[in-house]
Regions:
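Compact, charge-rich alpha-helical regulatory domains located at protein termini
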Residues: 430-500
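Short acidic, hydrophobic short linear motifs in intrinsically disordered regions
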Residues: 214-235
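A short beta-strand element within the Helicase C-terminal
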Residues: 108, 115-132, 166-168
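Conserved C-terminal RecA-like helicase domain
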Residues: 28-108, 137, 141-146, 226
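Acidic, low-complexity intrinsically disordered tails
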Residues: 501-515
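Conserved interdomain linker/interface between the two RecA-like ATPase lobes of SF2 helicase motors
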Residues: 1-36, 83
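C-terminal helical accessory/scaffold domains
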Residues: 203, 208, 245-254, 258, ...
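Conserved segment of the helicase C-terminal RecA-like domain
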Residues: 144-181
Length: 515
């Protein structure tokens, strides 16, 4: 196979050759930044004047209420039939790219390996530019063989009547070429390990089995896990029994399960009696929460009952949960700022601050930064602001926002179960504001259908501040602010029927002769 060299970058040359032969390709790289720069390099070599692509690039640009520099970068690439794809993009943008690649409008996608996982997006060529990625203190490490198989599995499109597909690995030298051949083409894939070996997963499953009455005793639990991949792989089941016994002890201590005996029993004795979940344990299981997280939330809420809390108190609590990991990391230049915010909110926090010498202190500071970002969103700062100030991409922020909403919903439910009515309203308000990204003053307006934070702020600035104002405001003014259809819909939502004025007819005095 002969590829014309039109640049100094082999992956760019192969991508351009793919377009020249009327095919599509996925270019796999190891970082989000590389995905973007590679897409840009390919697009700069193309001269395309396609109306459909121009319209598509405009759609990409308007995917967010306020386009970021990343949106503009992507839009420019898409106008040439090239795109980048990674977790930092908003979901709507990723969906647009995937759909239009399937349609054949987008010819090249430069992406991270996440695209190969769980997305059916075949291409004629799968180009593996990077088979190594940064592994922390270990430096650059070869990716797993299983991951390589996922990527090469994208090559070939039976639905497009391709007889074959091409998977191309790029090696920097002859020795690396030999290593790639041995490791990936001739090598064996790694073993698959059970997720139950991860303690949070095991905890959740144990509580779930007890809650659904699938397992009513420690013996039934052990019998179940003996038949799992986890039990088979672990080998020494005595060790698994020790782990399960410890987890049962934790669940009992946290109030999520109880035994038939009212008096205290040891961890060994607990296996001889029946296990039952409590109503609180049932709710934790239904919420799909890790029981450890649920206990952490409940402990934090008990502290909240004893002090004056703010929205920041609950945002920082949410940011401390395992489910939000990895958190937004504090950069060196941000330490002073983050510590200043910590000092300002110290008396309102419901999560205990560790010692600065504790290994958990960095994570604690990261939770403060994450809470700051959530609070900025609630203060109606847009995605562009978050990207510029904190280098947080819309896609990543969107994922964290969804997780935080789930944790806050779970917090609400646990507060209800425990009758923590004094703080329930504050938790609900924090969740609503975070979900909608609004200041407190906009809450009444955003409760109306089809009114988001941008429209609500526009109404507020023009004197329409609550439902009462929506009732009072003239339909003409409302139409000027929101458009005719939405203005009439809003009036209908509050129970007011407005008769539409026929086209060509005006209401009121038409001239001096009518005075």
């Amino acid at each position: 196979m002969k590829i014309a060299e039109v640049s100094t970058n082999p992956s760019v040359d192969i991508a351009l050759d793919t377009i020249n032969i009327g095919k599509q390709a996925l270019v796999f790289v190891n970082t989000k930044r590389s995905a973007e720069s590679t897409a840009e390099k390919i697009s700069m070599k193309l001269k395309t004047d396609n109306l459909e692509l121009k319209e598509l690039s405009e759609t990409i640009l308007k995917a967010l209420s306020s386009p970021t520099k990343q949106c503009r970068r992507l839009s420019k690439c898409v106008s040439k039939g090239v795109a980048f794809h990674h977790a930092g993009l908003a979901y709507s943008q990723r969906k647009i790219i995937e759909d239009n690649f399937k349609k054949g409008l987008i010819k090249i996608i430069s992406c991270t390996p996440s695209l190969a996982m769980g997305v059916n997006l075949p291409a004629f060529r799968a180009i593996m530019r990077d088979l190594k990625r940064y592994g922390g203190r270990w430096g650059m490490q070869w990716i797993p063989v299983l991951e390589y198989h996922q990527m090469v599995g994208r090559a070939g499109r039976p639905d497009f009547n391709d007889d074959y597909g091409e998977a191309i690995c790029i090696a920097s030298s002859e020795s690396e070429k030999t290593e790639v051949l041995e490791k990936y083409l001739r090598g064996e894939p790694e073993d698959v390990y059970s997720k139950l070996a991860v303690e949070p997963v095991l905890r959740s499953n144990i509580l779930g089995l007890i809650s659904t009455k699938f397992a009513r005793s420690k013996k039934e639990l052990l019998d179940f896990f003996k038949e799992t991949l986890y039990g088979y792989q672990y080998g020494d089941f005595t060790e698994i029994e020790i782990i399960i016994t410890k987890i049962l002890g934790d669940l009992d201590e946290w109030g999520f399960i109880k035994t038939d005996k009212d008096d205290f029993v040891s961890a060994d004795e607990i296996g001889e009696i029946n296990l039952r979940s409590t109503p609180l344990g049932d709710r934790v299981s239904q919420l799909y929460l890790d029981p450890y997280t649920a206990n952490f939330i409940i402990t934090s809420l008990r502290r909240a009952l004893q002090k004056k809390t703010t929205e920041f108190s609950y945002l920082q609590m949410v940011s401390n949960t395992l489910e939000l990991r990895p958190l937004f990391k504090v950069k060196m230049k941000e330490i002073e700022f983050v510590e200043a915010v910590l000092n300002d909110n110290a008396f309102n926090l419901i999560v205990l601050e560790p010692s600065v010498y504790d290994h958990e202190y960095d994570d604690f500071l990261n939770s403060i930064k994450t809470a700051i970002i959530f609070e900025d969103w609630m203060d109606e700062n847009n995605e562009e602001y978050l990207l510029e100030k904190y280098d947080v991409t819309p896609g990543l922020f969107g994922m964290k926002l969804n997780l935080a909403d789930w944790i806050l919903y779970s917090t609400e439910e646990l507060a209800k179960m425990l009758n923590f009515n004094e703080i329930l309203k504050d938790i609900s308000k924090t969740r609503f504001r975070l979900k909608k990204g609004i200041k407190e003053e906009l809450i009444p307006l955003v409760r109306l259908k089809k009114i988001g934070r941008v429209r609500a702020r526009k109404l507020f600035r023009n004197g329409v501040k609550d439902i009462g104002d929506v009732k009072k405001v003239d339909i003409t003014k409302l139409t000027q602010l929101l458009g005719k259809a939405l203005a009439y819909d809003l009036k209908k939502q509050i129970g007011e029927e407005i008769k539409e004025v026929p086209n060509g007819r005006r209401k009121g005095q038409l001239g001096l002769g009518k005075f």
